[in-house]
Amino acid sequence: MGKDYYCILGIEKGASDEDIKKAYRKQALRFHPDKNKSPQAEERFKEVAEAYEVLSDPKKREIYDQFGEEGLKGGAGGTDGQGGTFRYTFHGDPHATFAAFFGGSNPFEIFFGRRMGGGRDSDEMEVDGDPFGAFGFSMNGYPRDRNSVGPSRLKQDPPVIHELRVSLEEIYSGCTKRMKISRKRLNPDGRSYRTEDKILTIEIKKGWKEGTKITFPREGDETPTSIPADIVFVIKDKDHPKFKRDGSNIIYTAKISLREALCGCSINVPTMDGRTIPMTINDIVKPGMRRRIIGYGLPFPKNPDQRGDLLIEFEVSFPDTISSSSKEVLRKHLPAS
């Protein structure tokens, strides 16, 4: 007795072309050897491919419906259109059928974050144990009770974290970064891998703070057994020769002498846009003293038209030695406490 292709796919004899495609998709995924480790999986995978190749082809299906498998393969279906007898022989490579069905793309990509029909996310797929329970089929290929207990969900790999170092000038003005990553991708056979490079474009917005995260969902390595990891870039400030950052404020350290700290001085304060602002200090500069220039800091992330402040801190340089006469003058004029 020949093979019952309809039974193999789990469909009725009058099934539509769309029903045949859906059935093949479910059964091929179910019995793919990379997903199903049972001893019979390879043979079932091959049978499913052969059944689909016959039933999805109108001429083969018509002959099969009339004469069965023996007639299809034995030439009972008349001529092939060129004067010869039509005979069908399965090519023997179910993986080729599998790859062709998925259009040459990654055949497992439905598990890796793309959207499926009906708006359902692929990371909602149930793939461990009974990997195709979401389709309403049991492991033997026939419809099952939808109230049965579902298996566990496919897990996503942990995020891959990269530091993205940016200068204060880039934060001040905003910029575009292009980051090259290499990741593994499944080949159409669903088993082997290739290494693929990709350029990820990051728009650095004005005023972004250190620690800001930019996430590229599921751009990590592909495997048949997990959802690709998210690629995450975390903003990290580069050291600056003049400024330190304090949120949206920037800090400039002015170095002055002890005499200037006591007697007053004038300094030129640089700004982020390359200008300098003159500042006169008449007060005695005490430890921790700051001056503030409003609106000369970094843009606010949520309102880049407004900016933080430029803070001036003072670093007083003390002499290594002073003469005895200078000490006497200081003792005479400086308060004891």
Curated annotation (Swiss-Prot):
Transmembrane segments: none
Phosphoserine PTM positions: S122, S148
InterPro entries given in the database record: DnaJ_C (IPR002939), DnaJ_domain (IPR001623), DnaJ_domain_CS (IPR018253), DnaJ_subfamily_B (IPR051339), HSP40/DnaJ_pept-bd (IPR008971), J_dom_sf (IPR036869)
Domain of life per record: Eukaryota
GO biological-process terms attached to the record: chaperone cofactor-dependent protein refolding; negative regulation of transcription by RNA polymerase II
Chief location category: cytoplasm
Subcellular location, record wording: Cytoplasm; Cell membrane
Keyword field contains Phosphoprotein: yes
GO molecular function per UniProt: ATPase activator activity; protein-folding chaperone binding; unfolded protein binding
GO CC terms: cytosol; nucleoplasm; plasma membrane; Z disc
Record keywords, A-Z: Cell membrane, Chaperone, Cytoplasm, Membrane, Phosphoprotein
Keyword Acetylation (UniProt): no
SMART domains: DnaJ (SM00271)
Limits of the J domain: 2-70
Assembly with partners or alone: Homodimer. The C-terminal section interacts with the C-terminal tail of OPRM1. Also interacts with SDIM1.
Protein role: Probable chaperone. Stimulates ATP hydrolysis and the folding of unfolded proteins mediated by HSPA1A/B (in vitro).
Name assigned to this protein: DnaJ homolog subfamily B member 4
Organism: Bos taurus
Chain's gene name: DNAJB4
